[in-house]
Amino acid sequence: MEERPSETNSNVDSSAQPSVAQLAGRFREHAAVARETPASKPTRRKPPCSLPLFPPKVELGQNGEEKSPSGASHPPKIKVKSSPLIEKLQANLAFDPAALLPGASPKSPGLKAIVSPFHSPPSTPSSPGIRSHPSEAEEVPVSFDQPPEGTHLPSYNKVRTRGSIKRRPPSRRFRRSQSDCGDFRDYRAVEPSQENGAREENGDDVFASKSKDPGSPQLNQEAMADGVEGTPWSAEKPRRRNTCNSTEKPEELVRTPEEANAGEKVGQNPDTASQGHPEVQAPSQTGSPEAENGCGSPREETTPGEHTDTGKATEGTASEERVADEDRLGQKSPDANMPEEEGVVREKAPQTSSGKAEGTTIAEPDTKQKEEAPLEPSCSPGADHAAGEITSEIQNEKAVSMDDIPIEDTRM
């Protein structure tokens, strides 16, 4: 490393002796500058330093060997004086980072530092080490920082937003669809439930009348002793039955004669049919007028059907008690006479149905609708109270006959 600059110094001295023969004193003064020229020799490869040195050489061959170099040697030396200072500063600037890496002497890395930025072969050992680290430093954030920024972070956001988009609207759609479907299901469920509710209420009336039979003494005491207290219970049921839709009326009207016909089919003999038909007809009649009127109490409707079992003697007592109770409450007499007419018509109906075809029973509800239409104004606690007392007396007399009715016949 140190042999090359020594050889260059000897070459510079040999070449400078003939050129500085006339000006030996000046050359000795500038001997230090001549020794510093090895730093300028590598710089001759640079374009700015090489341009002023070549034209004096051309002048040496044309004009004269001694004159031209004297005039030509001084200006380039002056230029060299200014250049090495700048080159030293540049070499120091380029030398400080390069000197730390190899750890060599300050002179030789200084030469390499000057040569390195302009020549690829010497620059390859130093520059790749310098460039590799920043490239790695640049590549490391690219490899680790960009993936979370470019791929992972947007993917997390996208996944969350997509998940939210996939979750929320379906939930709202499902809620709306379920609410719509639920509304349709509610309407569909309410219609059969109301129909079933009307049937169950009809059945509850039958079971209530039957449940009163075994426990008749307690209910009869409450109805006879405290007749006014029995009216709220009879008045509550008509209010609850007002909720039945009008669409259910024809279905129940069609079913009531079918139930009556089923009661006829169960009876083997015409005598048993005539006995079982009015009893089965009574609960079926309780359902149809309740759905039609919505005000008629079950006790009002069960009494005329049960009059058929007792006969004309019970009708007379029932009519007298009704007239007495209605006179107390100030009701009209034609409303009280209507149930008696219904009882007479219902007495005639089972007799004709036992001997005639089933068409007579189907014609009965039409006549009942016409007769029960004027019964709507008679919806009052007085009529309910009167009906409650009559049913209590009749249930005492015919408790055994009502117990004999099978449950399946009423629910056909």
Swiss-Prot record:
Q: Which Gene Ontology terms describe the biological processes this protein takes part in?
A: cellular hyperosmotic response; skeletal muscle contraction
Q: Spell out the Basic residues composition-biased ranges.
A: 159-176
Q: Where is the composition biased (Basic and acidic residues)?
A: 248-258, 298-312, 319-330
- Post-translational modification (record): Dephosphorylation results in its dissociation from CAPZA2.
**Keyword 4Fe-4S assigned:** no
Q: Where is the composition biased (Polar residues)?
A: 7-20
Where on the tree of life does the source sit, at the highest rank? Eukaryota
Q: Could you confirm whether the keyword Phosphoprotein appears in this record? A: yes
The entry's keywords: Phosphoprotein
Q: Which residues carry this modification: Phosphoserine?
A: 68, 82-83, 105, 108, 116, 120, 123, 126-127, 135, 143, 177, 179, 216, 297, 333, 401
This molecule's function is given as:
Stress-induced phosphorylation of CAPZIP may regulate the ability of F-actin-capping protein to remodel actin filament assembly.
Quaternary structure, from the entry: Interacts with CAPZA2 and CAPZB.
Entry protein name: CapZ-interacting protein
Which species is listed as the source?
Mus musculus (Mouse)
